[in-house]
Amino acid sequence: MIFIDACFRKETPYTPIWMMRQAGRYLSEYQESRKKAGSFLELCKNSDLATEVTLQPVEILGVDAAILFSDILVVPLEMGLNLEFIPKKGPHFLETITDLKSVESLKVGAYKQLNYVYDTISQTRQKLSKEKALIGFCGSPWTLATYMIEGEGSKSYAKSKKMLYSEPEILKALLEKLSLELIEYLSLQIQAGVNAVMIFDSWASALEKEAYLKFSWDYLKKISKELKKRYPHIPVILFPKGIGAYLDSIDGEFDVFGVDWGTPLTAAKKILGGKYVLQGNLEPTRLYDKNALEEGVETILKVMGNQGHIFNLGHGMLPDLPRENAKYLVQLVHAKTRR
């Protein structure tokens, strides 16, 4: 698999490409599958439809890897927090974590309840071309914790940060509990058939450096270290969004570092490129315009050259991006990097 070879810095015929949120609303086929499911959460839980959606971008765009269609919040959902997705607003937990008692009441072994995810993986792997990789994923302990404490997405993360500074032992207990669940969750994804795993730390930028390293990065390192010990042949990709200023403190046992669009690739390559393969980092809105897209691709490829790079966006696909430009991006990267 070209994608897996690239994760391990092996020679590849061209630079592989996939896109975060490549299965999404910009595809009419996705909209149809979502309609059949009835709701976003039901789409995640319906393995047949989730498989359909996982495969769509591979078939339509020609990307080099599929990423499992699911949501990072299925883990806290199965730990006992009721979850709903409110149209135009996003996820909302009906209960939140407020004290040590609420952390202790969270179910242990929630990963055992996620058979619909593992079924999607095994179905997808059976239908996916042998040349294409399947990526599994989860959210980081910190990012999941913020949703569980705030109850929804937040601009200030005030409740989470208040807990971090005034009652750190409660937050640590939650992060520890989540980390143990996520290690087993990703292990079962690997056993079900994924070829690589990725951890999304979407709200990494909410924390100052010292707090980030202690309350997020340390837990990411713990998870990736255990996974590399169990499955050395499976690449681990970490994507801490918005921490370009902290790159000099990044270390750990993982293979690929995801670079967001706000972090210059030149800096990421200089600081991390010798140790980790870099993934990223085209600004997604460049896909609105072909000229802007071409300029962005040119800049990235000039910096990264032929090895140690997986092409991706620096954030997820937007719902109204033209699909023909997404397809063009894949063709362009393949053509420009063919060796």
From Swiss-Prot:
GO molecular function: uroporphyrinogen decarboxylase activity
EC number assigned by the record: 4.1.1.37
GO biological process: protoporphyrinogen IX biosynthetic process from glutamate
General function of this protein: Catalyzes the decarboxylation of four acetate groups of uroporphyrinogen-III to yield coproporphyrinogen-III.
Organism phylogeny: Bacteria, Pseudomonadati, Campylobacterota, Epsilonproteobacteria, Campylobacterales
Catalyses which reaction(s): uroporphyrinogen III + 4 H(+) = coproporphyrinogen III + 4 CO2
Cross-referenced InterPro entries: UROD/MetE-like_sf, Uroporphyrinogen_deCO2ase_HemE, Uroporphyrinogen_deCOase
Compartments in which it is found: Cytoplasm
Family according to the record: Belongs to the uroporphyrinogen decarboxylase family.
Residues at which substrate binds: 21-25, 71, 147, 202, 315
Keywords on record: Cytoplasm, Decarboxylase, Lyase, Porphyrin biosynthesis
Gene: hemE
Keyword Cytoplasm: yes
Protein name: Uroporphyrinogen decarboxylase
Assembly, per entry: Homodimer.
Annotated site location: Transition state stabilizer: 71
HAMAP family in alphabetical order: URO_D
